[in-house]
């Protein structure tokens, strides 16, 4: 692994770094996607997953004491998140992060590693230039301003309600079975799923609904 540029240093992350890491991820997303979707709570809940070891599975790059880049590896080494603040890009920090994350993924026993990047973005080009290839394509759906979704009644015998009690575990099972059909997708533990869905900071009960028959 190449050394970081002069003036930069690497260290482990702690929960107290959440706000700084969010600021880096947000700045990177704005530069790559042109709009901000990530929320502080997204990172908070990811770090709260029982399977995630923040001290071992994540890294920060600092400059003058401030975090300017960060990366983390999760889901048994198969999924990475990483960002370099736009003000510090083009100095080899991204390459250093990629090497660190790849090494950590191998140590977790992963045979592949993936990260989401907007098509045609700087991050997308960086990953391709680093030897990565497109695995899946996903779309962000948007409802145009002023548009309305027409009411569509459920078929007879079905009912919609807010998930409570045993509904939560049943909803987890449905999600795992549905998305488990994706090639290469590993089953997520119930505890990890809860951390990012039901127990995510700010989540309201109405945000998880189920259809019953």
Task: Describe each region flagged by the PLM.
Residues 16-18, 25-108, 118, 212-213:
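Conserved donor-binding loop and adjoining core beta-sheet/short helix segment
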